[in-house]
Amino acid sequence: MLPSQLIGFLLLWVPASRGEIVLTQSPDFQSVTPKEKVTITCRASQSIGSSLHWYQQKPDQSPKLLIKYASQSFSGVPSRFSGSGSGTDFTLTINSLEAEDAATYYCHQSSSLP
């Protein structure tokens, strides 16, 4: 059995004009095996429309954008990664997990991308 670590920050604080938006991600850790389906959720403390992005970060590497604006796959990202949701509830799904997917995954709220 080859476990994959899927770790996310539980709270991300993002300043906004209407006050701070808190993103709560779960689970904070998940051990799974290849070929499994993995679901990671992100909940915003107030509605953010579709301004939610998902990133993958591997050790000693910069974060890689996977999904932009809740459900739009970024160029070159494998089709097993998908995103959904709007308003306050969002989901990142990895279908048929591969060993190379072992990483930290996190959500980020922003109306624009860097």
Swiss-Prot record:
Residues 54-68 are annotated as: Framework-2. Residues 69-75 are annotated as: Complementarity-determining-2. Gene3D superfamilies: Immunoglobulins (2.60.40.10). GO terms for cellular component: extracellular region; immunoglobulin complex; plasma membrane. Residues 76-107 are annotated as: Framework-3. Residues 43-53 are annotated as: Complementarity-determining-1. Residues 20-114 form the Ig-like domain. Residues 20-42 are annotated as: Framework-1. GO terms for biological process: adaptive immune response; immune response. Keywords: Adaptive immunity, Cell membrane, Disulfide bond, Immunity, Immunoglobulin, Immunoglobulin domain, Membrane, Secreted, Signal. Disulfide bonds join C42-C107. InterPro entries: Ig-like_dom, Ig-like_dom_sf, Ig-like_fold, Ig_sub, Ig_V-set, IgV_Light_Chain. Residues 108-114 are annotated as: Complementarity-determining-3. PROSITE patterns: IG_LIKE (PS50835). Residues 1-19 form the signal peptide. Pfam families: V-set. It is found in: Secreted; Cell membrane. Its main location: secreted. V region of the variable domain of immunoglobulin light chains that participates in the antigen recognition. Immunoglobulins, also known as antibodies, are membrane-bound or secreted glycoproteins produced by B lymphocytes. In the recognition phase of humoral immunity, the membrane-bound immunoglobulins serve as receptors which, upon binding of a specific antigen, trigger the clonal expansion and differentiation of B lymphocytes into immunoglobulins-secreting plasma cells. Immunoglobulins are composed of two identical heavy chains and two identical light chains; disulfide-linked. This is Immunoglobulin kappa variable 6-21. It comes from Homo sapiens.
